[in-house]
Amino acid sequence: MDARLLEILVCPVCKGPLHYDRGAQELVCNADKLAYPIRDGIPVMLVDEARQTVEGTPVDPAGPAQGR
């Protein structure tokens, strides 16, 4: 995932930051607990396509899954 793209994309619900989960190929909003899929390298930023993340397991923005 292109780091420049990650800098401009925000959660479509709360307009908050997203974190790249490389293993799951998702962009995650910890505030709304939503994960948006990345298909064929393209983020699908539709709320209807997002999945709920597990309560209490936020993506660590400083962790190894963070795209930079």
Curated annotation (Swiss-Prot):
Alphabetical list of NCBIfam families matching this protein: LSD1
Pfam families in the cross-refs: Trm112p
Family: Belongs to the UPF0434 family.
Name this polypeptide is given: UPF0434 protein BTH_I0741
Listed InterPro entries: Trm112-like
HAMAP family given in the database record: UPF0434
GO cellular component: cytosol
UniProt-listed Gene3D superfamilies: 2.20.25.10
